[in-house]
């Protein structure tokens, strides 16, 4: 669920996700095309690909079960589809944290028109 994903990102990075990631680069937020602008944008590209592989549930809207253990996200629950969504979100939140040093403010609210090169395949 997008609100759960937001909480993961906030706790992992300390950044407000809606401001910092919702419109970052060519792939963060809704849709995506072209080549990812940097490592953070690539996190979003990989997250989009992860969501594409999920079948049987709605990644953006279905709630899943997770907890925090020693600063890490632990996905749980009995529903394999929802657990898969959680794992996609977990991986992206960790990716954002791991790439904070190369995060570039100039890619916030990046115009889609500048993402016109050929899109990569998942």
From Swiss-Prot:
Regions that span the bilayer: none
Record-annotated active site: 47, 89
List of residues binding Ca(2+): 27, 29, 31, 48
Leading EC class: hydrolase
Keywords: Calcium, Disulfide bond, Hydrolase, Lipid degradation, Lipid metabolism, Metal-binding, Neurotoxin, Presynaptic neurotoxin, Secreted, Toxin
Catalytic function, reaction form: a 1,2-diacyl-sn-glycero-3-phosphocholine + H2O = a 1-acyl-sn-glycero-3-phosphocholine + a fatty acid + H(+)
Chief location: secreted
Disulfide bridge map: 26-115, 28-44, 43-95, 49-122, 50-88, 57-81, 75-86
Entry EC number(s): 3.1.1.4
One Gene Ontology MF term: toxin activity
SUPFAM superfamilies, per the entry: Phospholipase A2, PLA2
GO biological process: arachidonate secretion; lipid catabolic process; negative regulation of T cell proliferation; phospholipid metabolic process
Cofactor: how and how many bound: Binds 1 Ca(2+) ion per subunit.
Subunit structure: Homodimer.
Protein task: Snake venom phospholipase A2 (PLA2) that inhibits neuromuscular transmission by blocking acetylcholine release from the nerve termini. PLA2 catalyzes the calcium-dependent hydrolysis of the 2-acyl groups in 3-sn-phosphoglycerides.
Name of the protein described by the UniProt record: Basic phospholipase A2
Source species: Gloydius blomhoffii
């Amino acid at each position: 669920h997008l609100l759960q994903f937001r909480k993961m990102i906030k706790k992992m990075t300390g950044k407000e996700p809606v401001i910092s990631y919702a419109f970052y680069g060519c792939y963060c937020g809704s849709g995506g095309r072209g080549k990812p602008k940097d490592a953070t944008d690539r996190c979003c590209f990989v997250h989009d690909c992860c969501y594409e592989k999920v079948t049987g549930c709605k990644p953006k809207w279905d709630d899943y079960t997770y907890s925090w253990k020693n600063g890490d996200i632990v996905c749980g629950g009995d529903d394999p589809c929802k657990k898969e969504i959680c794992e996609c979100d977990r991986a992206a939140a960790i990716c954002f944290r791991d790439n904070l040093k190369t995060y570039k403010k100039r890619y916030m609210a990046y115009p889609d028109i500048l993402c016109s090169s050929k899109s990569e395949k998942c």
